[in-house]
Amino acid sequence: MASSNLIKQLQERGLVAQVTDEDALAERLAQGPIALYCGFDPTADSLHLGHLVPLLCLKRFQQAGHKPVALVGGATGLIGDPSFKAAERKLNTEETVQEWVAKIRKQVAPFLDFDCGENSAIAANNYDWFGSMNVLTFLRDIGKHFSVNQMINKEAVKQRLNRDDQGISFTEFSYNLLQGYDFACLNKLHGVALQIGGSDQWGNITSGIDLTRRLHQNQVFGLTVPLITKADGTKFGKTEGGAVWLDPKKTSPYKFYQFWINTADADVYRFLKFFTFMDIEEINALEEEDKNSGKAPRAQYVLAEQVTRLVHGEEGLVAAKRITECLFSGSLSALSEADFEQLAQDGVPMVEMEKGADLMQALVDAELQPSRGQARKTIASNAVTINGEKQSDPEYIFNDEDRLFGRYTLLRRGKKNYCLICWK
């Protein structure tokens, strides 16, 4: 992405929700590289899909020659951002937040280049400047620059104040000051001139712009990316099992890949613009090709491949595709023990069973059939496979050969109903 028209290119991809003083920012970018930052609060032990768009935006700016700062909120994570939240967040312990900070720093690292010369990325933690700050310094040097009148009129806070059942604590109310000071501090330390974040962060970003001007007399800018929505109105980044995480131990690469494969046609080309680095022309050509092919669209596979590779690397993508192909074909010989571990984690329904169980009981315990009688009929009708092999004997009892890697047996009823038995 050429730096001179970077904002326009982001707008073409639908990646700009709001921007402060767009002309002045475009002019500043045209003058040469800038430093910019995005903050990630450790509210869990992993980032999730909602963090991916701003994180990839940092990467887009770095590819255009700018210097990204990834700020992990070791201090702000102890407080909790009230922006557009219906209720007060539960406060986490300092030890927990520090553990999460370390995990999130590791997660952010592969997306950015920390060794590429002048625009090498920087990892920062706002606990470094807040951890030793006393309350008098905070109130005198930061608090005096904030108007409570303006703070309570910010949309992100106003929604909470207008709820009869929920107020807002002074702790969360102060969050706006902390994030504002982050911007001013990073401006002084690293010359940061731009903050990016989700559109729910607009109020916090503008506070930081104002504080930086007051403290350092510098003009800085803010840009927000849209909160991703799906065409059908349902929430993006959620499955029946909850959030889709970037940590492979919380959402397996297979499950992650399947999430993107299941993207609706109405969303897929937009998501290619948000979550991949494909050229707009390439995405438009793919859309045209899918429209005229008369076959199932290819876009979902392109999207799943690109994003899984970005997040889980080539190895994660290869494993996800291998598991997908084996489940589709019914031949499990190519699956490794690690592949079965992914399936057991979240890939297919899983049940633990004692050795010596019979097939009818397994179908009932696996909730593939409601009763032994129904299970008997299904088995006899040749509709059940064990590890890809059909089994039509209702009295069948599992043996050691059925236990792949000594632990796993994959049952299938019909074409798509799977359950993985993990033997105790």
From Swiss-Prot:
Endpoints of the signal sequence: none
Pfam family, one: tRNA-synt_1b
Similarity field: Belongs to the class-I aminoacyl-tRNA synthetase family. TyrS type 1 subfamily.
Renumbered ranges of motif 'HIGH' region: 42-51
Subunit-structure text: Homodimer.
Organism superkingdom: Bacteria
Chief localisation class: cytoplasm
SUPFAM superfamilies: Alpha-L RNA-binding motif (SSF55174), Nucleotidylyl transferase (SSF52374)
Subcellular location field: Cytoplasm
Residue positions binding L-tyrosine: 37, 175, 179
InterPro entries tied to this protein: aa-tRNA-synth_I_CS (IPR001412), aa-tRNA-synth_Ic (IPR002305), Rossmann-like_a/b/a_fold (IPR014729), S4_RNA-bd (IPR002942), S4_RNA-bd_sf (IPR036986), SYY-like_C (IPR054608), Tyr-tRNA-ligase (IPR002307), Tyr-tRNA-ligase_bac-type (IPR024088)
Entry binding sites for ATP: 238
Catalytic activity: tRNA(Tyr) + L-tyrosine + ATP = L-tyrosyl-tRNA(Tyr) + AMP + diphosphate + H(+)
A Gene Ontology cellular-component term: cytosol
PANTHER family registered for this protein in UniProt: TYROSINE--TRNA LIGASE, MITOCHONDRIAL, TYROSYL-TRNA SYNTHETASE
One of the GO biological process terms: tRNA aminoacylation
Enzyme Commission number(s) from the entry: 6.1.1.1
Matches recorded under PROSITE patterns: AA_TRNA_LIGASE_I, S4
Entry keyword set: Aminoacyl-tRNA synthetase, ATP-binding, Cytoplasm, Ligase, Nucleotide-binding, Protein biosynthesis, RNA-binding
GO MF term (any one): ATP binding
Domain S4 RNA-binding: 357-414
Function: Catalyzes the attachment of tyrosine to tRNA(Tyr) in a two-step reaction: tyrosine is first activated by ATP to form Tyr-AMP and then transferred to the acceptor end of tRNA(Tyr).
Record organism: Salmonella typhimurium (strain LT2 / SGSC1412 / ATCC 700720)
Name by which UniProt lists this protein: Tyrosine--tRNA ligase
Placement of sequence motif 'KMSKS' region: 235-239
